[in-house]
């Protein structure tokens, strides 16, 4: 009975979310097409914010202010340009040393570990995190600390070669996931995402979708929060075997990613694979091309590697389709040319026939005139 109620609640919440968006999946895909064409607009807005922060950093009169602005610049560059985000994490570390503030040093070290983890430097990231004394960490940094360990071990598990290593990395991921749940407030986005992730790991997909949708319906969510929520919802649907649900929420996640002008993302790449499987080669090519361009600009080497494994297949299909269309166009032009020739020949013969008829009528008229004279 409890399971039936849970499924019913999930369906109701799913309906509410669909109503909130009020768009079909096809409409969302068309929206993505438009955003990709005009994505420079969103990038320009982000660049303007970065320029303003850099100006404030130059005008700062104390190391405390400089540290704060470097932190905000790190946040802006996070998932936008990893090399630049690492530079500002290093600047934070320098300022923290100068101010002799241990919590600032730990925060800067975790910033650097985050960038290392995102670029696939897992060993270096763990070594850096291992230098942090957990006992001296202030309460406000515990969530970030556990989040980094959970994320890095999760990625290591995803890319592990042997089953033994994969099992061990996922065991560590589970431990840090539980630690995160203990330090995050139960009404926070972080808690909901981690709890939903735990439900998904334990095959409780409907429960995960229910809590994610419930949080998604809260007002005033920023694009980044929407992107994370809808991506996790799509994962729930994927594991349920619901491709349409997966596609719909991947589209919502991709829209939020593109609007927030991030360059390091997953949703659009996965959406490209889905639409490719459905035979929409042009759209798949455009989505994957956009993902590759953004990953390259961001210096997101791991994402670039993931895309490069799929791109040749879709690119080949796209080129074959383009070649086939060119051949069809050539055949059409040849057919049109032949038809034009036949038409000209037909017009010529009709014209000659009409002249013959005219001469015949003229001859007949002359004969009739002669008869009247006789």
Which residues does each predicted region cover?
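A "functional boundary" signal
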Residues: 4-9, 15-323
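Single conserved hydrophobic/aromatic residue that forms the stacking wall/gate
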Residues: 362-374
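Alpha-helical transmembrane segments and their juxtamembrane interfaces
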Residues: 12-13, 372
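Alpha-helical transmembrane signal-anchor helices
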Residues: 319-361, 365
């Amino acid at each position: 009975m409890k399971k039936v109620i849970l499924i019913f609640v999930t369906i109701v919440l799913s309906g509410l979310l669909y109503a909130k968006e009020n768009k079909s999946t096809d409409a969302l895909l068309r929206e993505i097409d438009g955003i990709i064409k005009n994505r420079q607009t969103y990038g320009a807005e982000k660049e303007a914010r970065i320029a303003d922060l850099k100006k404030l950093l130059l005008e700062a009169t104390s190391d405390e202010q400089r540290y704060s602005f470097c932190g905000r610049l790190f946040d802006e560059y996070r998932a936008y340009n990893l090399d630049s985000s690492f530079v500002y994490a290093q600047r934070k570390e320098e300022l923290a040393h100068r101010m002799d503030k241990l919590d600032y040093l730990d925060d800067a070290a975790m910033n650097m570990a985050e960038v290392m983890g995102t670029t696939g430097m897992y060993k270096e990231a763990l070594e850096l995190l291992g230098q942090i004394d957990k006992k001296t960490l202030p309460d406000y940094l515990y969530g970030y600390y556990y989040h980094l360990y959970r994320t890095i071990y999760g990625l290591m598990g995803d890319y592990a070669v042997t089953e033994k290593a994969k099992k061990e990395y996922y065991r560590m991921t589970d431990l840090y996931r539980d630690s995160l749940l203990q330090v995050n407030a139960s009404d926070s986005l972080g808690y909901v995402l981690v709890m939903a992730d735990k439900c998904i790991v334990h095959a409780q997909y409907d429960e995960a979708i229910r809590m994610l949708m419930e949080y998604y319906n809260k007002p005033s969510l920023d694009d980044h929060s929407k992107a994370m929520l809808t991506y996790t919802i799509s994962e729930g649907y994927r594991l349920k075997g619901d491709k349409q649900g997966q596609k719909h929420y991947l589209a919502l996640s991709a829209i939020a990613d593109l609007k927030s002008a991030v360059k390091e993302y997953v949703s659009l790449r996965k959406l490209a694979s889905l639409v490719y499987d459905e035979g929409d080669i042009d759209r798949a090519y455009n989505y994957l091309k956009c993902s590759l361009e953004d990953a390259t600009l961001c210096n997101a080497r791991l994402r670039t590697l993931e895309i490069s494994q799929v791109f040749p297949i879709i690119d080949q299909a796209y080129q074959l389709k383009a070649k086939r269309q060119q051949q069809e166009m050539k055949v059409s032009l040849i057919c049109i040319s032949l038809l034009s020739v036949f038409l000209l020949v037909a017009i010529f013969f009709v014209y000659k026939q009409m002249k013959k008829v005219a001469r015949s009528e003229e001859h007949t008229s002359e004969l009739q005139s002669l008869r009247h004279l006789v």
